[in-house]
């Protein structure tokens, strides 16, 4: 294998000089992975533009070996952190793409363990992938997401084709025939949630009782024996969602709390109907003083599910007992 596989590759160019390119790389072998990934990285390196890679360690080694000395010009991130949780990846990508690079295109290759967290996590990854097409539509960036068809479920591969406008293989791009516009995908793939357990602890609130809800949530968090930072994150997320319910959900609601051996849950229900197809997925404007609650919660929680139900709008926050959100880069 040559020390620098970029040297022999010609740059076929990028369609358009601005805007997002979002493609899925579906592969079944190490060679198919390299044949699809290397052209992406080489284009960025040849142009002297930023290249970021967040893939599992064994894939990163393949890329480093293939790139040779040029791998030093690639920013390699630990995928176990960068791609651990959909909301955290969304926040990290937002921070990375928003940096001022004087119009240079940004190149990103990412691969998470898309199926590893169970069906609910896999579905959330797919919703996040779909929303990227809206959230970063104006970003001058080429984002390629790799999927190992040899180990992933057929449903996950089908979702990849539905949430990425393009497919790439061997350095060649094609339109994904299965692609669904984000609003259509969101409508067809809402979160599926079981009802809270009958023994969930519940507290009602309105604008006059926000302080008591926060104190009640603090007491509940203390009983969970969380670390100080972890408990603080939980309380921030609960506060944001309860405040959001008061301001936008009819002025009142009910919060339910329960736990499992792996996770803690808070579900906030308030009157109303969900009207936004991408609640909390779109990055707020830098100067936006309000409307950040759901976005912040997605950066803190391991999962945030929002749905319209018979009781109104339900926002369910899931916190891992062990995982904590990484500090912003």
PLM features: residue spans?
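Conserved beta-strand-loop-beta-strand hairpin that lines the nucleotide-binding pocket
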Residues: 191-196, 243-329
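Short glycine/serine/threonine/alanine-rich loop segments
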Residues: 49, 141, 226, 251, ...
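Short, well-ordered alpha-helical scaffold segments within catalytic/effector domains
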Residues: 34-38, 129, 210-214, 239, ...
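Conserved short strand/loop->alpha-helix "switch" segment adjacent to the catalytic nucleotide/phosphoryl-transfer site
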Residues: 207, 211-240
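Non-catalytic sensory/regulatory segments that transmit input signals in bacterial signaling proteins
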Residues: 1-207, 322-329
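Amphipathic alpha-helical segments that form the core helices of the histone-fold
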Residues: 42, 238-243
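Short glycine-rich, polar/acidic loop-and-turn segments at beta strand-coil junctions
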Residues: 55-58, 238-240, 259, 270
